[in-house]
C-alpha cells in the first residue's frame, strides 16, 4: 500500500516531490511555480457511520485534488486498510502528471476509503459505497463537471455502478449524470474496453518501446516482444490483462507470476487464463499445476528475465532488492512500484524503466473516452459503422470488376467490417500511447541532463501544466 515508512525514510509522496524538484531544476522554473506544482490544492476527509451486523461502524475516507487547472479532475478510488492522506495526495499528483503526459484534458485527483473489502458482504459494501458517494457528492467531490472518480485497488465496475446510481437519485435532472464516474458497467454507461484498458496500455507502451530500435538496444534487448521473458508481479486486473495480451498477441513468455500467497514459475511460459481461473477458484496461485510454486514471491522478483512488470502495490522495489533485480527493462504497471532511491540504483546500473506516469495511463485515457461517450449520449461507431462497411464493399466490388479476380473471403471480411466501439477505443488508446512515448523519447534525447524516461516524462508533463498555469493566470 502506501509507502509512508519506506526504506530510507522517503514516502511515496516525497518520492513524487523529488522527481518534480529534479525536473523543475532541469527546466529552470521559478520557485513560485515549483510550489504551485507540488501543492495539493484541496483534500477532503470524511468519517461516517454505516450499520454493519446491527451496529454502527465508522469509516474514514479521503478525496484529494492536486490540480484543477483542467476540469473535471480525474482519478480512482481505492478501498484498502492502509490507505491514508499521504498516499491519496501522492496519487492525485501522479494523476495530474499522467493526464498531462498523455494529453487527457483533466486535472489530477484520487480517493481512498480505509477498509478491507473482503471483510464485508456485497450488501454491506453497497451500503458503504453509497454512503461514501453521498459524502463526496455533498462536498462537490463527485460530479460530471468537477470531479470524476474511477475504479482502483479494491473497487471495480460494481462500485462505480452504485456511485453513479447514487448521483442519479440525488440529481435526477442532470442529463449528464452518467459522466459522474467512469469504469462503470457497459449497461450503465460504461465504454467497451475500459476493463482491459490499463493492462492493454502497458502492452502498447512496450510495443512502442520495441518499435524504436535505438531504445531497445539501450536496454540490451533485440528484436520485438516475441520470446521475451516476462515476470509479472500481481495478477489483478492490470497484471492479468498485460500478461494475457503480451503472451497471446505478442508471443512473449510470461515465465513467472507473483501473487500475495507466493509465485508460480514456468520457463516455457505460463498459461495466463488457466492461472487466473485457478486464482479465482482457490484464492491464490498455490496448487496451480502449470508451473512450480515458490512461497516467497519476493525472491521471484530477482529471477533472470528480460522484462519485469510490477502491477500491484507501491514500493515493491527498494534499496533492499534493487541491486538484485536482473531485468533489463521494468514497465511500471502499478503506481510507484520503485522507490526514489531504488530508481537511482537501477538507473546507475543501466536498467531502463518505463515510468508509471506513462506506462499505466491506459486507464485514464479510456476513462476520458467513456466520459466523452457519456456526454455525447451515443456509443462510438453507431453513426458510421455501416457507412464504412458499405463503402468498403463498393471498393472491393470495384477492384473485382477492374481486375476480373475474386478477392479472398478473409481479405473481404477484414476490409469490409466496420469498426465497433471496442475497435475504436483500442485504436484511440494505441494512438495515445504511441504519441506520448514519442514525446517522452524526444524529450529525453533533447537534453543531456535528462537521463531517463521518468525524468523525461516529468519534464514533459510540467512543461504542459506550467503553460496552462501561465495561460490562466496562476
Please report, for each region that a protein language model flagged, where it lies by residue.
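Short, Gly/Pro- and small/polar-rich lid/capping loops
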Residues: 4-45
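Conserved active-site and cofactor/substrate-binding residues in soluble primary-metabolism enzymes
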Residues: 11, 15-18, 41, 83-86, ...
Amino acid at each position: 500500500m502506501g509507502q509512508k515508512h519506506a526504506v530510507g525514510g522517503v514516502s511515496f509522496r516525497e518520492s513524487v516531490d523529488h522527481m518534480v524538484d529534479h525536473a523543475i531544476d532541469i527546466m529552470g522554473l521559478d520557485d513560485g511555480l515549483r510550489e504551485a506544482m507540488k501543492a495539493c490544492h484541496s483534500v477532503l476527509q470524511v468519517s461516517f457511520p454505516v450499520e454493519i451486523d446491527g451496529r454502527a461502524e465508522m469509516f474514514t475516507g479521503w478525496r484529494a485534488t492536486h490540480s484543477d487547472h483542467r476540469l473535471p479532475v480525474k482519478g480512482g478510488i481505492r478501498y484498502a486498510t492502509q490507505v491514508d492522506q499521504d498516499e491519496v495526495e501522492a496519487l492525485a499528483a501522479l494523476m495530474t502528471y499522467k493526464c498531462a503526459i498523455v494529453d487527457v484534458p483533466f486535472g489530477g485527483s484520487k480517493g481512498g476509503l480505509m477498509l478491507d473489502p473482503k471483510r464485508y458482504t456485497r450488501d454491506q459494501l453497497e451500503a458503504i459505497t453509497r454512503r461514501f458517494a453521498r459524502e463526496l457528492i455533498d462536498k462537490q467531490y463527485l460530479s460530471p463537471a468537477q470531479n470524476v472518480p474511477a475504479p482502483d485497488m479494491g473497487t471495480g465496475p460494481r462500485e462505480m455502478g452504485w456511485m453513479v446510481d447514487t448521483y442519479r437519485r440525488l440529481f435526477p435532472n442532470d442529463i449528464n449524470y452518467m459522466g459522474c464516474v467512469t469504469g462503470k458497467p457497459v449497461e450503465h454507461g460504461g465504454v467497451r474496453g475500459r476493463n482491459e484498458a490499463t493492462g492493454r496500455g502497458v502492452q502498447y507502451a512496450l510495443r512502442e518501446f520495441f518499435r524504436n530500435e535505438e531504445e531497445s538496444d539501450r536496454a540490451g534487448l533485440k528484436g520485438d516482444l516475441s520470446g521475451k521473458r516476462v515476470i509479472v508481479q500481481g495478477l489483478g486486473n492490470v497484471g492479468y490483462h498485460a500478461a494475457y495480451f503480451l503472451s497471446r498477441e505478442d508471443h512473449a513468455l510470461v515465465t513467472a507470476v507473483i501473487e500475495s500467497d507466493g509465485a508460480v514459475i514456468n520457463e516455457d511460459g505460463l498459461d495466463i487464463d488457466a492461472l487466473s481461473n485457478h486464482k479465482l477458484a482457490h484464492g491464490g496461485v498455490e496448487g496451480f499445476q502449470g508451473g512450480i510454486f515458490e512461497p516467497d514471491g519476493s525472491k521471484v522478483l530477482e529471477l533472470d528475465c528480460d522484462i519485469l512488470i510490477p502491477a500491484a502495490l507501491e514500493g515493491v522495489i527498494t534499496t533492499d532488492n534493487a541491486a538484485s533485480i536482473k531485468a533489463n527493462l521494468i514497465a511500471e504497471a502499478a503506481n510507484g512500484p520503485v522507490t526514489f532511491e531504488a530508481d537511482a540504483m537501477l538507473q546507475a546500473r543501466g536498467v531502463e524503466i518505463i515510468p508509471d506516469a506513462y506506462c499505466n495511463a491506459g486507464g485514464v485515457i479510456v476513462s476520458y473516452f467513456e466520459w466523452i461517450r457519456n456526454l455525447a449520449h451515443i456509443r462510438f461507431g453507431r453513426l458510421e459503422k455501416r457507412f464504412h462497411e458499405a463503402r468498403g464493399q463498393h471498393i472491393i466490388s470495384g477492384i473485382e470488376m477492374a481486375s476480373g479476380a475474386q478477392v479472398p473471403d478473409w481479405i473481404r471480411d477484414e476490409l469490409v467490417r466496420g469498426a465497433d466501439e471496442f475497435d475504436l477505443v483500442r485504436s484511440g488508446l494505441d494512438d495515445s500511447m504511441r504519441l506520448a512515448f514519442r514525446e517522452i523519447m524526444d524529450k529525453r534525447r533533447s537534453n543531456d541532463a535528462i537521463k531517463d524516461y521518468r525524468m523525461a516524462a516529468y519534464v514533459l508533463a510540467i512543461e504542459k501544466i506550467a503553460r496552462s498555469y501561465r495561460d490562466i493566470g496562476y
